[in-house]
């Protein structure tokens, strides 16, 4: 039973199927619909579509209220309807819970108001990186990015170091394992690796494992110390306080700049609109900081 809306939901499902012929459709019941007791499954059964329809009943007040709880509900429902195996869902749920913990302890969800900050001057930070490479300093770039936003943060790695110092290749560490995650996530890793203009020295894990691949990257740098390192994507998941050397973070959140400085990063650069710029893409997209590095190479 859906109070006055069951027929509308059935018609919407039929229209969506007729228009797009999808293999899967997701139906999410939100606060108002769940409070009054709507039965999503009945409407789905009545629509009788030739595809798998996954209902997710989500509303405010559920569980602890973390923004990852809804994603966990989707994973559980996907298992129930045979979309993904239980083992894969459990792995992703573990990552989501670790991501929540990182945000609460090291990121934006620490419980206090954080003033937006657009970070350090991109030109000055780019010059610092280029000077270090020219001066034969050991430099590392760590890509610890989240899913599709990796298309933007990978652009920061996409410069030709030989134009700066052909004898000083930076170390590249990245969470671009193409064998981890669902096919869409694995394909992101494949696409980026094909477009990168440099070899990757160490792969820390998959693109949905950013809550734990930061530590893996740090462990690698402990064994291969550098003078300067740049962490792109989710830099607050990287234990900067444990790694010596000059540190630069590149983040997509103006409200992450202050927490990253508090963690110990010497410089923080903010890339704006990472999610909107990478929505639906399958290619590396231009980043302001990546563009600045490439431009500054020719400056003396």
Would you name each region that the model predicts?
Residues 1-300:
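An N-terminal assembly and electron-transfer interface module characteristic of large anaerobic redox
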